[in-house]
Amino acid sequence: MSLIANPKVSDWLEFHPSGELSIHTGKVDIGQHISSALVLIAAEELNIKPNQISLSPIQTGSSPNEGYTVGSQSMQHSGYAIKKAAATARNVLTAQAAKYFDVPVEQIRIEDGHLIVDKTNQSISYWELTKDGQLECDVDETANAKNHSKHELQGRYHVSREMLDIVTGRHEFIQDLKLPSMLHARVIRPPQYHSTLIELDEKLLDKFAAEKIHLVRDGSFLAVAAANEYSAVK
């Protein structure tokens, strides 16, 4: 499902000149640590260190559209897509390195994101081969993932990057955030998914304005926002 809506490698992976990689997902980490799992998948397939990878903040307008984060489907959808995107990127960049050095693909090995010609000191990195940071080719779903017998990260002991902050109390949950001029909001749920907002009660709008409650409308999406949470809930 995820690859149908987001078929390009660049929808999932972005190489940065600094030697880092961003991975994109449409799944939200709400405590299940999917972010750590997705980082490990990409790191395993691309032979780079997990600390070289960051998960891009999820944004409606730019992140892959993967629908809801429900039903334990994040690995099935986003995990699969990132694995295939990473395997495709590895194959494409290995082929480019082989062409660059004029050697067979079989003579290229990968260590920490560097494509090295066997028995030589010749090497080139993923980041040198992707100077604009993007791979605009389609994800190849037939690209073979790394054989599990060669896994160096998956299935092995790994502490997720945010775990230390969680167990020591330094981690900030969304309920802990207090920002300047922050508003609390509640979405007004329609009776069914395909409902269309036809009109709004003008008297209700006047009442909201008098109580300094903001109404947010985008098409059939409707929400209220207020300076305190109780007013928004009420």
Regions from the language model: what does each represent?
Residues 1-234:
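Cofactor-binding beta-sheet edge motifs in enzyme active sites
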